[in-house]
């Protein structure tokens, strides 16, 4: 018989199954951590190998350049020696030729005189006369001046041995090895058709003057610059949905020209559908990605809406005015609950908008508070949060209340927007009565 305290077989079987599941889950978790550990080890080894190669190549190039510079300097100094030697030796060579000519003349005169003297007065009187006459024509008391040694160049080389200490000090301080880059990507935030990239310094001793952000599709071979500046946040636009992109950032130290090492690349993607304008509207020309609308010269009026209700509460909708045309008080940029044709502006019911003169309209009524006028380069943002969502049945009191914040040119207005029905995704739109206005939405 079984012991009184022994569990039933069904209980034991259930516990065994639970233990197996727990062990499998534990094994999966350990496997994931092991994979992460291997990636970390690979990053250390690969970055160390790359750093060794960079150091070897750099110092090899440096030695070659320094050797070339020293050789060029040596050639220059030797040419200076040659020039001084040639210019200062020529007068002395000329003087030497003159003296040697005088010596030869004196030798000839001595020989002729000795012969004439040996011949006697009576026998060689003609020779004596000719010798005396010849000697009188030679200035035997005229001697060329030979410069003193202190008056002629004495070449030497002046070499400052302290350059060795200076070069040595610079070489000993040249280059550093860092265990990690001074900046790292901190956060990737998906946006419709874009990704916000935020980065931060991780080296407190590094003073950054500028940052440089690059990105690429994970299937591409090369990164490309997308931002250079002093900000620590940038939105990368023209991002295809559900496509992985890699981002990396580096920095330039204060007063320096060279860039720091790149941060560890971070991978991100956006699952949000890009905001697009409706195609086929006669009064507007669209970009290839349909996120930029240009009011053209066509004599057409009405509101250009988004192709679908792609704005959801809790997101930030941004309009950037690229170029401007002539303003009109009926112009509008904003959001609405539904597309309604036949209206020339979003200054109507079930819509909130800002006009190009800065006036704010809620359900067609102008607010007392006003924002600055829209100019070229202005950015207008809409942040909408649901206060009460309402219901889909109007007889149950289905009004929805939304908290709307419109920001432009460092000013903002906040108000509640009442809708007649439950809040779902919203449309956005714009209307301009004169050509030249170009608006990017993201």
From Swiss-Prot:
Record localization: Cytoplasm
Disulfide bond residue pairs: none
Top-level taxon of the source organism: Eukaryota
Coiled coil feature spans: 10-46
One GO BP annotation of this record: positive regulation of receptor signaling pathway via JAK-STAT
Gene3D superfamilies to which the protein is assigned, alphabetical: Immunoglobulins
Name of the protein in its database record: Cytokine receptor-like factor 3
Record lineage: Eukaryota, Metazoa, Chordata, Craniata, Vertebrata
């Amino acid at each position: 018989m079984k012991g009184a305290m022994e569990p039933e077989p069904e209980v034991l079987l259930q516990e065994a199954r639970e233990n197996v599941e727990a062990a499998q889950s534990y094994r999966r978790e350990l496997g994931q951590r092991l994979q992460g550990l291997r990636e970390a080890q690979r990053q250390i080894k690969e970055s160390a190998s790359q750093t060794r190669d960079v150091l070897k190549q750099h110092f090899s190039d440096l030695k070659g350049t320094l050797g070339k510079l020293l050789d060029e300097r040596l050639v220059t100094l030797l040419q200076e020696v040659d020039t001084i030697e040639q210019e200062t030796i020529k007068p002395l060579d000329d003087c030497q030729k003159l003296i040697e000519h005088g010596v030869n003349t004196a030798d000839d005169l001595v020989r002729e005189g000795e012969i004439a003297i040996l011949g006697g007065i009576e026998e060689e009187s003609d020779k004596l006369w000719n010798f005396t006459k010849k000697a009188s024509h030679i200035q035997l008391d005229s001697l060329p001046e030979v410069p003193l040694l202190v008056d002629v160049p004495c070449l030497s080389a002046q070499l400052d041995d302290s350059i060795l200490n200076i070069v040595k000090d610079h070489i000993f301080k040249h280059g550093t090895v860092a265990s990690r880059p001074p900046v790292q990507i901190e956060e990737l935030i998906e946006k419709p058709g874009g990704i916000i990239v935020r980065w931060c310094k991780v080296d407190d001793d590094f003073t950054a003057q500028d940052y440089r952000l690059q990105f690429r599709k994970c299937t591409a071979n090369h990164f490309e610059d997308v931002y250079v500046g002093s900000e620590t946040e940038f939105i990368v636009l023209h991002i295809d949905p559900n496509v992985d992109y890699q981002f990396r950032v580096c920095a330039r130290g204060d007063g320096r020209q060279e860039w720091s090492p790149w941060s560890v690349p971070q991978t991100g993607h956006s699952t949000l559908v890009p905001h697009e304008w409706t195609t086929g509207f006669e009064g507007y020309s669209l970009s290839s990605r349909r996120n930029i609308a240009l009011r053209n010269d066509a004599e057409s009026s009405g509101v250009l809406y988004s192709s679908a209700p792609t704005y959801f509460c809790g997101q930030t909708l941004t309009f950037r005015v690229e170029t401007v045309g002539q303003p009109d008080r009926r112009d509008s940029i904003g959001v609405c609950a539904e597309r309604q044709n036949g209206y020339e502006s979003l200054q109507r019911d079930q819509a909130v908008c800002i006009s190009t003169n800065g006036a704010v309209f809620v359900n067609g009524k102008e607010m007392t508070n006003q924002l600055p006028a829209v100019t070229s380069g202005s950015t207008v943002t809409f942040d909408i949060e649901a206060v009460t969502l309402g219901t889909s049945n109007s007889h149950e009191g289905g009004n929805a209340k939304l908290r709307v914040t419109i920001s432009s040119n460092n000013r903002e207005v906040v108000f509640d927007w009442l809708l007649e029905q439950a809040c779902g995704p919203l449309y956005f739109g714009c209307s301009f009565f004169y050509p030249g206005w170009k608006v990017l939405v993201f």
